[in-house]
Amino acid sequence: MFIKTGDKVRVIAGKDKGKEGTIKKVLASQNRVIVEGVNIVKKHQKPSNSNPNGGVIDTEAAINASNVMLIDPSTNEPTRVGYKFVDGKKVRVAKKSGKTLD
């Protein structure tokens, strides 16, 4: 997957189009990501030891990885991601600027 935890991304499709956030979690087997502050849903919580009252809480839901685009740290613009071998290691490369991301 072209995105890693901690990357800054912009949502390019869906109800949160245009919002930016950092990747909290990558679900590679499902090709989905959880982005901080994006795709907020209401979740009904049963009372438990950690939350004795229960109730409705707001939480981030996963979105498809194809709906986000990595933001190039050097230009602060969304870019596609390519791969290149440098010193025998495979590194991610921003397609717009050509700079390595790892």
Swiss-Prot record:
Q: Which CDD domains match?
A: KOW_RPL26 (cd06089)
Sample GO molecular function, one term: rRNA binding
Q: Which Pfam families match?
A: KOW (PF00467), ribosomal_L24 (PF17136)
Q: Which SMART domains match?
A: KOW (SM00739)
Which SUPFAM superfamilies does the UniProt entry name for this protein? Translation proteins SH3-like domain (SSF50104)
Q: Which InterPro entries match?
A: KOW, Rib_uL2_dom2, Ribosomal_uL24, Ribosomal_uL24_CS, Ribosomal_uL24_KOW, Translation_prot_SH3-like_sf
Query: Gene Ontology terms, cellular component aspect?
Result: ribonucleoprotein complex; ribosome
Q: How does it assemble?
A: Part of the 50S ribosomal subunit.
The free-text function statement in the UniProt record for this protein reads: One of two assembly initiator proteins, it binds directly to the 5'-end of the 23S rRNA, where it nucleates assembly of the 50S subunit. One of the proteins that surrounds the polypeptide exit tunnel on the outside of the subunit.
Q: Which family does it belong to?
A: Belongs to the universal ribosomal protein uL24 family.
Which HAMAP family does the entry mention?
A: Ribosomal_uL24_B
What this protein is called in its record is Large ribosomal subunit protein uL24
